[in-house]
Every structure is written in structure tokens, then in C-alpha cells.
A protein has these predicted regions:
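Alpha/beta catalytic barrel-like cores
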Residues: 1-136
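Conserved anion-binding
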Residues: 130-137, 144-174
Length: 174
């Protein structure tokens, strides 16, 4: 039987509601959110402050009604500070997007972060998005599998839950 550490259990409780359900609000979009807001207000009227304020307001108003919020620190730093103190925090740990010139949509972690640093910033868990095509070349799949193994080892070392967000795609369709 698999066992969960006390630290992970306590963090999972912080992320869960009274029924043991993780009812999380996800607003960790970065590049796509910036593009949507630029389109909505127009290039000439757009500023990054609008993105920061949007995430702050959403966090401030909605974290009273959810058990956890998923935010990125890059654009969501104000939202992290504005969240309800009873709401758990899941922080994005991957770089946004992928290099379209490199086959495989390989995952990359934020270069200046670690799970230990996310914990120090108040995270109860981390999230990593991984693009996955099971029919891709074995060399690419091996890189992704090794990436996830290293991520699991790091999570075990600092006793933090990590959620993997798999995005399944077909590399033959662009």
C-alpha cells in the first residue's frame, strides 16, 4: 500500500474543501491571457498592469468560494497576495509555451525557481504542464519521462505535492 507523508497530506488538506475535494480556480495563463487582453482592449490601450490587476481582482473575489487557486508568479504575483488566507495555493512551475522550432514540445521549468523556493513563497503544491503525444519518437518520450522522474524526485525531497497537467496532442497535426 502506498503511503503519503504527513507534510503532503497536510498540504493536500489545505488545498481541499470540507468534503475532501480540491475545488480549484486556475488562472495561471500567461501568454494566452496577455494576447486575449491585448485583443480585448486594443494594442494601444493595453498595459501589463491590466493583467496583474485582473489576476489580483479575480483572486481577491473568488478565493472565498474555492478551496485552492492555481497562479503563476510572473503575472499573478498580486493575485497570490490577494487570495483568501484559507484558500490553498498551487503555483505554476513550468515556463509558459514551448519552442515551436524544437520537435516534441519539450517541457521546461522556470529557470530561477525550485520547489523549495515555491514552498518558501507559500505554495501548498506546484503544477507542471507537459505536452504529450504517445505516438511521438521514443527519444522524445524518454526525455519527457526522465523530466517527470526528476520532478518526482525533487517533490519527494521537499515534501510537496506536484500536479502534472498533461496536454495530449498529435505532433502530425500543426
Amino acid at each position: 500500500m502506498k503511503r503519503i507523508s504527513r507534510g503532503k497530506f497536510e498540504k493536500m488538506q489545505q488545498l481541499s474543501n470540507d468534503h475532501g475535494v480540491i475545488a480549484a480556480l486556475a488562472i495561471d495563463q500567461r501568454g494566452s491571457m496577455k494576447k486575449m487582453m491585448q485583443t480585448a482592449v486594443g494594442e494601444e490601450k493595453f498595459s501589463m498592469d491590466q493583467v496583474y490587476e485582473f489576476k489580483e481582482l479575480v483572486s481577491q473575489e473568488l478565493t472565498k468560494h474555492v478551496s485552492a487557486i492555481l497562479l503563476d508568479e510572473q503575472y499573478g504575483f498580486k493575485g497570490i497576495k490577494a487570495k483568501d488566507p484559507n484558500c490553498g495555493l498551487i503555483m505554476s512551475y513550468e515556463k509558459t509555451g514551448y519552442d515551436a522550432n524544437t520537435p516534441g514540445r519539450l517541457p521546461e521549468l522556470l529557470p530561477d525557481e525550485s520547489l523549495d523556493r515555491l514552498l518558501a513563497k507559500g505554495a501548498d503544491a506546484a503544477k507542471v504542464l507537459v505536452y504529450y503525444d504517445p505516438d511521438e519518437a521514443q527519444e522524445i518520450l524518454d526525455v519527457k519521462h526522465a523530466f517527470l522522474e526528476r520532478l518526482g524526485t525533487e517533490a519527494l525531497a521537499v515534501d510537496i505535492p506536484v500536479f502534472v497537467e498533461p496536454i495530449v496532442y498529435d505532433s502530425k497535426i500543426t
